[in-house]
């Protein structure tokens, strides 16, 4: 599933080609996503100029003069730029054609993504209860410490809770906990303030670096420019269960936490 760095990579790839451009038409070949694409999307968006392409958590917000298209890539979706009129292949469900001659094409083999229309996106039911962005000053170790008091849930699913902080998915939670030396099974309420301060620093560092590297290449992900990400080449824990720790050589262990696989080093993480 594309996580925050992958979505931000996509945003940075498509924004320069969309912002300031006028939409000539919208072609919806299959509206059956996680939530149906609005039947009148072409009517709502065609003729409008795209003002800004923003991101909130893992949602892309394509802001027009009136209204905003909220897009989520789901498990396997991607948005990329193609020449308008390029014949569509299987799973290429939507084209947003621009007067420039380019089209923003949405591909989603599993159809778990979304394309929704809203006049007030930040108060949309999918966005209104989201926590702070991890790369802003609204998120820090103090917030993690305060929100974790009395929590018996394991620390990994705690930091993956979008009400606590957005965009820390399975890959980056695994890597940040490894870098901070925290066992992902530890109860969130038992982690000290000092260790949460360290964890927040690592979350920010790892997410920022992953964005710089173009995200993580996993299964279907490609950026808005059609290129894969390269952060996977530098993973220390995620997907490495049974392999030696790159720091100490101990065999990494894999456990299930909140229905997700979690890999950790029993020596480096306490």
UniProtKB/Swiss-Prot annotation:
It catalyses: Hydrolysis of DNA containing ring-opened 7-methylguanine residues, releasing 2,6-diamino-4-hydroxy-5-(N-methyl)formamidopyrimidine; 2'-deoxyribonucleotide-(2'-deoxyribose 5'-phosphate)-2'-deoxyribonucleotide-DNA = a 3'-end 2'-deoxyribonucleotide-(2,3-dehydro-2,3-deoxyribose 5'-phosphate)-DNA + a 5'-end 5'-phospho-2'-deoxyribonucleoside-DNA + H(+). The gene is mutM. Its EC number is 3.2.2.23, 4.2.99.18. Belongs to the FPG family. Its cofactor is Zn(2+). Binds 1 zinc ion per subunit. It comes from Pseudomonas syringae pv. syringae (strain B728a). This is Formamidopyrimidine-DNA glycosylase. The active site is at residues 2-3, 58, 260. Monomer. Pfam families: Fapy_DNA_glyco, H2TH, zf-FPG_IleRS.
């Amino acid at each position: 599933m594309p996580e925050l760095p992958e979505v931000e990579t996509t945003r940075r790839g498509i924004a320069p080609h969309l912002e300031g451009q006028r939409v000539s038409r919208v072609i919806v070949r299959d509206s059956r996503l996680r939530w149906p694409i609005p039947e009148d999307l072409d009517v709502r968006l065609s003729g409008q100029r795209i003002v800004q392409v923003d991101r909130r958590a893992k949602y892309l917000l394509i802001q027009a003069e009136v209204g905003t298209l909220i897009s989520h890539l789901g498990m396997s979706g991607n948005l990329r730029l193609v020449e308008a009129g390029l014949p569509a292949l299987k799973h290429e469900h939507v084209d947003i054609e621009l007067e420039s001659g380019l089209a923003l094409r949405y591909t989603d083999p599993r159809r778990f993504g979304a394309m929704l229309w809203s006049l007030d996106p930040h108060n949309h039911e999918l966005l209104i209860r989201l926590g702070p962005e991890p790369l802003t000053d609204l998120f820090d170790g103090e917030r993690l410490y305060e929100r974790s008091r009395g929590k018996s849930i394991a620390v990994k699913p705690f930091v993956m809770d979008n009400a606590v902080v957005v965009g820390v998915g399975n890959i980056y939670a695994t890597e940040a906990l490894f870098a901070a030396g925290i066992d992902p099974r530890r109860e969130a309420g038992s982690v000290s303030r000092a260790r949460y301060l360290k964890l927040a620093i690592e979350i920010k560092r790892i997410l920022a670096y992953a964005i710089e590297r173009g995200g993580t290449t996993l299964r279907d992900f490609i950026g808005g420019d059609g290129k894969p990400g390269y952060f996977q080449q530098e993973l220390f824990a995620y997907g490495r269960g049974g392999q030696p720790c790159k720091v100490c050589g101990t065999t990494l262990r894999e456990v299930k936490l909140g229905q997700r696989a979690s890999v950790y080093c029993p020596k480096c993480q306490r």
